[in-house]
Curated annotation (Swiss-Prot):
Cofactor (UniProt): glutathione; Co(2+); Mn(2+)
Intrachain S-S bonds: none
Source species: Serratia proteamaculans (strain 568)
Name this protein carries in UniProt: Inosose dehydratase
Keywords for the protein's UniProt record, in alphabetical order: Cobalt, Lyase, Manganese
GO BP terms in the entry: inositol catabolic process
Ribosomal protein as UniProt keyword: no
Signal sequence segment: none
Length: 298
């Protein structure tokens, strides 16, 4: 891949899990970002332990050569909470802008079961036509607001949400304006659709409108256990549904090849949440960085 086009980041969720703070509670913010840099990454997303004052956070990252590239934002348009979502989005956007980020990765969390004990496949939510329209209108408005700061909004398709499957991604992308983008996540695409082919089809179809990429691998044997026992998303994470690129079933070589051939410019973020007591975050960060160097050449 062209190293002038692509930068590599890693998410802090491997050190401390924001959805389950007990996973990795012993890992400090400074340990986390120091190990990111030591493993060879130059970017990070924002975790729950990160200072939220740019004047405090930026120097701590600068000294380690780490840049903020994105931070999760939850939207609740389908639930009808448009004004509250937009007010909170503006504060979030201003923080990311101050940190030098260009992308705002959002997830539509109305009816989401990702943080509950419900079976991630059996009890996933579905939106009504009216709710879909609220989501599309809301994201179009967020994109207009972000444009004023020279930033772009993207939707993170995610297990346990109303925008998870290929069909749901298709519907979302057909309803929003062209200046609303997609955050492509290899792990969530594979987990939802069950095959490399289906994952690649999403990437190929929407690559011109993908402005942020999450790299996570999947352990098929854990997915099989999740399905067989009707486990929740978080139960799956604790058992090891996800891991870093090169440690699971996904072949990332065609992913990197397609991104390179189509001239993708932006961040690729290793975002692979698992139990840090079972998968040492630093060791797995190094493993991911080596795999990317070997397979993507960057």
């Amino acid at each position: 891949m062209n190293k002038d086009n692509v930068k590599l980041a890693i998410a802090p969720i491997g050190w401390t899990n924001d959805d389950m703070p007990d996973l990795g509670k012993e890992n400090t913010f400074q340990q986390c970002v120091s190990e990111m840099a030591l493993a060879g990454f130059t970017g990070s997303e924002v975790g729950s332990k990160y200072p939220r004052d740019p004047a405090v956070l930026k120097p701590m990252l600068d000294i380690r050569g780490i840049q903020i590239c994105n931070a999760w934002f939850s939207t609740f348009f389908a639930d009808g909470l448009k004004e509250k979502t937009i007010d909170e989005f503006i504060n979030h956007m201003n923080f990311l802008h101050a940190m030098g980020a260009k992308v705002i990765g959002c997830s539509e969390q109305s009816k989401s079961i990702q943080g509950t004990t419900k079976g991630v496949f059996e009890e996933k939510p579905y939106f009504s036509d009216e709710e879909w329209q609220r989501v599309a209108d809301g994201y179009n408005e967020l994109a207009d607001i972000a444009k004023g700061k020279g930033m772009q909004v993207c939707l993170h398709h995610h297990m346990g949400t109303g925008i998870q499957t290929t069909a749901e991604i298709d519907r979302y992308m057909s309803m929003v304006n062209d200046d609303v983008y997609l955050l492509f996540d290899t792990g969530h695409a594979y987990y939802s659709e069950g095959s490399q082919q289906a994952m690649m089809a999403i990437l190929e179809k929407y690559l011109p409108r993908i402005n942020h990429v999450h790299l996570k691998d999947v352990r098929d044997e854990v997915v099989a256990e999740v399905k067989a026992n009707k486990l929740s998303f978080l139960d799956g994470v604790k058992k090891g549904t996800f891991t870093v690129p090169g440690d699971g079933v996904i072949d990332f070589r065609p992913v990197f090849k397609l991104l390179d051939e189509r001239g993708y410019k932006g961040w690729m973020v290793v975002e692979a949440e698992q139990d840090p007591a079972l998968a040492n975050p630093f060791e797995y960060a190094v493993k991911a960085r080596r795999y990317i160097k070997e397979t993507a050449g960057i």
